């Protein structure tokens, strides 16, 4: 005997309020809208099932694999799809515990083009299939398959296939996914259709609240075509909005001196322990020069602060607020207040000391060690980050210095001997008389004062 999810066992009664004649829940879900046409005007004709997110290609032909349940969609990147052992099998009436076994299949959804021309990939959606059905019907429980997560009830026999019929979307609608109490849904995922009501159910509830005088109007409303909301429209709209915001946010913003000054002043107005250094307000403006008590930061990281590309991996080592208070040694110290001319106030310091322990199994260990070695005590290295550039000179002083340099750079011919140095001065009568005695003709030439005649 094959079991049909959503149908009561023999002898059971199905509620006329929540179920139709076949016992299937009639709550409209996104999965149902995927499988049904845009309206219900094709009465009397067999609905042609559309290809759903679980449609799989097989040898050139399309073979649809319809899950009995609505999907689970991922909305946060980087999250893993997983359930605890014994959890993860959706609840369905008429399915005994021994048949509650199967797998969740990851469907990588299509991408779309954003207004700025970029391709965006929708996050995947997961669908449940009983063991022995679906796209991996021939797989055994626990096989290592990419994009497959196996789940089973603690009472289920995973060595045999589930005796569950395949779902025909023309006669059976998808069942809203529900789990047993205590089941923990994977973080970063949500169940399709949870917390959402279809437009038809909303209009029906409104018509019932209006009273008997408006029954004719409510019945006419119920004959309205079903909502033409396309599958994944909510995700597409959200993605388009985010893409638009991302486009605007991604445009380069012009940073003026005034805006940079305002950002810097806003940061410096905060308490010291609440400041976040960045390009507009570097590390040394926030926390002072590097030294023995503040010994972290190389030249590049001191300029960029937390905007440095290497900073996020270091942030993994930062303690949480709880670790800071409960995992550190704290000491409250009263400091001297300001000078005599300043108002009297009590100043305290909450001094702390602690340690962050990690080993080589930490993800990114090699990179963390490299960044730490480059930035610890970087101020002690030659040409380190704490080298202060000379202050610029004023214009008047700079011009005077340039003139002085020009005078200093003038090349002056040096005398070759002491005689040449003496000739450069004016000769006295005594000098002329002495020279006349030395010369044969007794006459001192007029050009004797010139260095070239000596």
From Swiss-Prot:
Q: Annotated region Dimerization: where?
A: 267-383
The region called RNA-binding is annotated at: 56-197
Modified residue annotations for Phosphothreonine: 177, 428
**Polar residues bias located where?**
50-61, 215-227
User: Where mainly located?
Assistant: virion
Q: Does the keyword Transcription apply?
A: yes
Report biased composition (Low complexity) as residue ranges.
Answer: 193-212
Q: Which residues does the UniProt record annotate as the domain CoV N NTD?
A: 64-193
User: What's in the keyword line of the UniProt record?
Assistant: ADP-ribosylation, Host Golgi apparatus, Phosphoprotein, Ribonucleoprotein, RNA-binding, Transcription, Transcription regulation, Viral nucleoprotein, Virion
Q: How does the record describe the protein's post-translational processing?
A: ADP-ribosylated. The ADP-ribosylation is retained in the virion during infection.
Q: Which residues form the CoV N CTD domain?
A: 260-383
Q: Name one GO molecular function term.
A: RNA binding
- Phosphoserine: residues carrying this PTM: 162, 170, 194, 389, 424
Region named Disordered:
1-62, 160-179, 186-230, 271-292, 382-428
- Give the binding site residues for RNA: 109, 125, 167
Q: Give the UniProt record's GO annotations in the biological process aspect.
A: symbiont-mediated activation of host NF-kappaB cascade; symbiont-mediated suppression of host translation elongation
Localization in the cell: Virion; Host endoplasmic reticulum-Golgi intermediate compartment; Host Golgi apparatus
**Subunit structure, interactors included:** Homooligomer. Both monomeric and oligomeric forms interact with RNA. Interacts with protein M. Interacts with NSP3; this interaction serves to tether the genome to the newly translated replicase-transcriptase complex at a very early stage of infection.
Task: Describe its function.
Answer: Packages the positive strand viral genome RNA into a helical ribonucleocapsid (RNP) and plays a fundamental role during virion assembly through its interactions with the viral genome and membrane protein M. Plays an important role in enhancing the efficiency of subgenomic viral RNA transcription as well as viral replication.
Q: What is this protein called?
A: Nucleoprotein
């Amino acid at each position: 005997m094959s079991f049909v999810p959503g149908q009561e066992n023999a002898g059971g009664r199905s509620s006329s309020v929540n179920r139709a004649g076949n016992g299937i829940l009639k709550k409209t879900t996104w999965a149902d809208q995927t499988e049904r046409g845009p309206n219900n005007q094709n009465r009397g004709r067999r609905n042609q099932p559309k290809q759903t997110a679980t449609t799989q290609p097989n040898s050139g032909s399309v073979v649809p694999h319809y899950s009995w349940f609505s999907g689970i969609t991922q909305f946060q990147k980087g999250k893993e799809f997983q359930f605890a052992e014994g959890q993860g099998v959706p609840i369905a009436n008429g399915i005994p515990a021994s048949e509650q076994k199967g797998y969740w299949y990851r469907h990588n959804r299509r991408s779309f083009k954003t207004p700025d021309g970029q391709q965006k990939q929708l996050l995947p959606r997961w669908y449940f299939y009983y063991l022995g059905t679906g796209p991996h019907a021939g797989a055994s429980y626990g096989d290592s398959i990419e994009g497959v997560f196996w789940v089973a009830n603690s009472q289920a026999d995973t060595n045999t296939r589930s005796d569950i019929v395949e779902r025909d979307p023309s006669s059976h609608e998808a069942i809203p996914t529900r789990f047993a109490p205590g089941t923990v849904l994977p973080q970063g995922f949500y169940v399709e259709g949870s917390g959402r009501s279809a437009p038809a159910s909303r209009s029906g509830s409104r018509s019932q609240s209006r009273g008997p005088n408006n029954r004719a109007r409510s019945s006419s409303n119920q004959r309205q075509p079903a909502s033409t909301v396309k599958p994944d429209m909510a995700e597409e709209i959200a993605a388009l909005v985010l893409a638009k915001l991302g486009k605007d946010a991604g445009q380069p913003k012009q940073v003026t001196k005034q805006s940079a000054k305002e950002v810097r002043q806003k940061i410096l107005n905060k308490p010291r322990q609440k400041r976040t250094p960045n390009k507009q307000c570097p590390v040394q403006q926030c926390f002072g020069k590097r030294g023995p008590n503040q010994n972290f930061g190389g030249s590049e990281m001191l300029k960029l602060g937390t905007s440095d590309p290497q900073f996020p991996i270091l942030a993994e080592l930062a303690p949480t607020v709880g670790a800071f208070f409960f995992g550190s040694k704290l000491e409250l110290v009263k400091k001297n207040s300001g000078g005599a001319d300043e108002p009297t106030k009590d100043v305290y310091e909450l001094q702390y000391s602690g340690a962050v322990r990690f080993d080589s199994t930490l993800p990114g260990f090699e990179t963390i060690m490299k960044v730490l070695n480059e930035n610890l005590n970087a101020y002690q290295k030659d040409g380190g980050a704490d080298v202060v550039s000379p202050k610029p000179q004023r214009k008047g002083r700079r011009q005077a210095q340039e003139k002085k340099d020009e005078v200093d750079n003038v090349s002056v011919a040096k005398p070759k001997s002491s005689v040449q140095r003496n000739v450069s001065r004016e000769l006295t009568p005594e000098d002329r008389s002495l020279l006349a005695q030395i010369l044969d003709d007794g006459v001192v030439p007029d050009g004797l004062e010139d260095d070239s005649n000596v």
